[in-house]
Amino acid sequence: MDSNDNNDELLSRSEIDVLKVYFGDPIHVDEKIVIHQPTIGEIVEFGEIKFWYLANRLCANPTSMRLELWDAGVDWTEISDFDLFISIIATLDKEESSFIFGDLELQMFRPVVVKDEEGNEKPILVYLPDPTIQIDEELYKKIVGYLRVMFNIHPKVEKAKGKITKEWMINEERIALENEKKKRKDEKWMPSALFPLISSALNHPGFKYKKSELKDVHIFEFMDSIKRLQIYENTTALLKGMYSGMIDTKNIKEDQINWAKDIYNS
């Protein structure tokens, strides 16, 4: 089995304008395709479970969907990210597509095989209402690269050689899924990833937003705030320990006491 947690990025981090993502600006991946980043309030109105399902679908790679692919008779090691994306967007409805892409209906794209400059065949997506709108593999990488950063969804990549190894991996994932379903039966309400984070943030003295204001905060900014608060608390605890003599400063690295550090490229 070959596993790599860091090779999921489809484009370099240097190509991501993280400041635009942070401020929730529309992301123009080309002249006609624009990504809209939802706010917390929009996610609440849309439905959190629906939102995460949509986000995980759009950010998926073959590894993250290998169980579904395997059950459909497809080996996840033999399908590309782009081919998977082509099959996924065909299943979206208008509401799901418009939540992220506005008037652009992803389900209206159709795959067409064209030849590149070297005569090699490659698939592209053509938008039926306006054939001048097209998505090739490079543009797909840009779209999904932004979405993965925006929603903090970075699926790992796992390859496997041999049918026995693949079947073992699938069986392990199936067991984990069944265990998760059993666990969910005992929960008092629908699972929410955002609820404990929102509750914690609103009750933290360092969080600057009121509940009514939080609805206008974009998802990336909110999740960044959660990470930054955790780093701030850890940094403060370390500094107090250092000043009190309870912690040996020789074992503390400089970035451990810098709560304003870059938390994405470190």
Placement of each model-derived feature along the sequence:
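An amphipathic, hydrophobic-aromatic interaction surface with interspersed Lys/Arg
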Residues: 1-79, 148-241
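Intrinsically disordered, low-complexity coil segments
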Residues: 2-10, 114-123, 205, 249-252
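Generic structural motif recognizing short loop/turn segments at the entrances and edges of beta-strands
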Residues: 17, 25, 29-33, 40-42, ...
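Intrinsic-disorder/low-complexity coil detector
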Residues: 25, 37, 61, 110, ...
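General structural signal for secondary-structure boundaries
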Residues: 39, 80, 135, 218, ...
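Hydrophobic, aromatic-lined core segments that form the binding pocket/scaffold
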Residues: 84-187, 191-194
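Long, intrinsically disordered, low-complexity Ser/Thr/Pro-rich regulatory/activation regions
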Residues: 243-266
